[in-house]
């Protein structure tokens, strides 16, 4: 690995130099083990500890197939899907690997007794397989996490509809929390040159998800002047939605749960902020009964920020706890987009407020290559910024996943892989200086 790292840090190594570097036989990777999938049986979700299931193992370098690339990973980050993998909820991801392994002789590589996790990376291309023309060894890249086969016509209008669509590092093996990762070449995008490795790795999954859900025509299709209600507006997902709304000329109404989180939203430029804890909103009387009076009180509060207008778009991801209120406060003809259900999957709402007011509910999941590319392009232009708050070593990934699981973080948490320290990889210092305050906005919160 030293030769690879030396070539990356030299900034003078050519593509031919990288192509000539010998690949190691093995590399360090964050894994979960198939023989431990029952280790948390009988425990509540909260009591399942990723630090017990996550391992740092030496694993063999995978075979490189057509249309693929091996990437030296300088940094990665932790998403909720890595937490789900580590606590084996809602199902063991080894089920995904087994199913993928049955697809073809090549995909059998993924069905292993260990799962290398992680759905973000920033690094350098080491090798490309047959049929890869747009990328070469030595290219500095980030990767989005959509893995598709595109052998069915269903995926050719929107690749997220490919029947064989999977999330890399969650539903496939050889993910980004490792020193080397295996990706398809159509996952690669240029690394933003004003960001360090760990900063560039952080936006990936959540930035692309927020872009599709809020901006893309496959999501809400946000336009200038729209009133956008954003739940968890300072979090890993909501913080990107807040930035997209502000950059796109919309009016974000940011819902948070503390004054500290309200301050984060203000630092991004948001003015309309609702601290749901301070204002005492309780949308459920008990576990089975919602409180429409609270919906109405919430809607009245929103209209104080919008000049009496209702919400055009709701950026939903809490799910069960908030969904009834989300449907209620949306204007006639408005849109509720949802990409998750962190408070519960079984949603309840009064359907009269949906059908009689011609509202729409849109399910949104990650992003296609074009959407991920556009989201990354905005980061590269300095229009959207990383929300990196803390960085861990590869050895401490279990602690990073634990902190995300227990919601002890803000924004995104990063993980250094091959990068020996933070702050490396910046190629455009002038652009960085223009945006340094925004880049560091979430640091050490």
Curated annotation (Swiss-Prot):
GO biological process per UniProt: fatty acid metabolic process
Protein name: Crotonyl-CoA reductase
Assigned keywords, A-Z: Metal-binding, NADP, Oxidoreductase, Zinc
Family in the record: Belongs to the zinc-containing alcohol dehydrogenase family. Crotonyl-CoA carboxylase/reductase subfamily.
PANTHER family: QUINONE OXIDOREDUCTASE
SMART domains found in the cross-reference section: PKS_ER
Temperature note: Optimum temperature 40 degrees Celsius.
UniProt organism field: Streptomyces avermitilis (strain ATCC 31267 / DSM 46492 / JCM 5070 / NBRC 14893 / NCIMB 12804 / NRRL 8165 / MA-4680)
Gene: ccrA2
pH dependence: Optimum pH is 6.5.
Subunit structure: Homodimer.
Record's function text: Catalyzes the conversion of crotonyl-CoA to butyryl-CoA. It uses only NADP as electron donor. May have a role in providing butyryl-CoA as a starter unit for straight-chain fatty acid biosynthesis.
Activity regulation information from UniProt: Inhibited by NADPH at concentrations above 200 uM, by MgCl (30%), by ZnCl(2) (55%), and by CoCl, MnCl and CaCl (100%). Also inhibited by iodoacetamide, N-ethylmaleamide, the thiol group inhibitor beta-chloromercuribenzoate, palmitoyl-CoA and myristoyl-CoA.
Record-listed Zn(2+) binding positions: 149
Pfam families for the chain: ADH_N (PF08240), ADH_zinc_N (PF00107)
Source organism superkingdom: Bacteria
EC number: 1.3.1.86
Gene Ontology MF, one: NADP binding
Swiss-Prot/TrEMBL catalytic activity: butanoyl-CoA + NADP(+) = (2E)-butenoyl-CoA + NADPH + H(+)
Keyword match Aminoacyl-tRNA synthetase: no
Listed cofactors: Zn(2+)
């Amino acid at each position: 690995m030293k030769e690879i790292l030396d070539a990356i840090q030299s900034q003078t190594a050519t593509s031919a130099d990288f192509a000539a570097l010998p690949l190691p036989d093995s590399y360090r990777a964050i894994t979960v083990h198939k023989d431990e999938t029952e280790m948390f049986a009988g425990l509540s979700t909260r009591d399942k500890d990723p630090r017990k299931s996550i391992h740092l193992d030496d694993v063999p370098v995978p075979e490189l197939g057509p249309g693929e690339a091996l990437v030296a990973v300088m940094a990665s980050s932790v998403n909720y899907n890595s937490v789900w993998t580590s606590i084996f909820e809602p199902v063991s991801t080894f089920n995904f690997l087994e199913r993928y392994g049955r697809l073809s002789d090549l995909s059998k590589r993924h069905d292993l007794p260990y799962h290398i996790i992680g759905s973000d990376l920033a690094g350098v291309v080491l090798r490309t397989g047959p049929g890869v023309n747009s990328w070469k060894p030595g290219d500095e890249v980030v990767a989005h996490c959509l893995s598709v086969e595109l052998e069915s016509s269903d995926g050719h209008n929107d690749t997220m509809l490919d029947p064989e669509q999977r999330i890399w590092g969650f539903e496939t093996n050889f993910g980004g929390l490792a020193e080397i990762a295996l990706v398809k070449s159509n996952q690669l995008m240029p690394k933003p040159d004003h960001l360090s490795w760990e900063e560039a790795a952080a936006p990936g999954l959540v930035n692309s998800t927020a872009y599709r859900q809020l901006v893309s025509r496959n999501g809400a299709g946000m336009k200038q002047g729209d009133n956008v209600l954003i739940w968890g507006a300072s979090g890993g997902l909501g913080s990107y939605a807040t930035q997209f709304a502000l950059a796109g000329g919309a009016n974000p109404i940011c819902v948070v749960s503390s004054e500290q989180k309200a301050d984060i939203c203000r630092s991004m430029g948001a003015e309309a902020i609702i601290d749901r804890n301070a204002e005492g909103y309780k949308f459920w009387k008990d576990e089975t009964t919602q409180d429409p009076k609270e919906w109405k009180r919430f809607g009245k509060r929103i209209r104080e920020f919008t000049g009496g207008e209702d919400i055009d778009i709701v950026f939903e991801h809490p799910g069960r706890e908030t969904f009834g209120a989300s449907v209620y406060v949306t204007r006639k003809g408005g849109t509720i987009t949802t990409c998750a259900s962190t408070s519960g999957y079984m949603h309840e709402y009064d359907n009269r407020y949906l059908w009689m007011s011609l509202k729409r509910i849109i399910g949104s999941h990650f992003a296609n290559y074009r959407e991920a590319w556009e989201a990354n392009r905005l980061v590269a232009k300095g229009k959207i910024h990383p929300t990196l708050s803390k960085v861990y070593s590869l050895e401490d990934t279990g602690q990073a996943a634990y902190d995300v699981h227990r919601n002890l973080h803000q924004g995104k948490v990063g993980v250094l892989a091959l990068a020996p320290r933070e702050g490396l990889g910046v190629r455009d210092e002038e652009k960085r200086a223009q945006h340094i305050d925004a880049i560091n906005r979430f640091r050490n919160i």
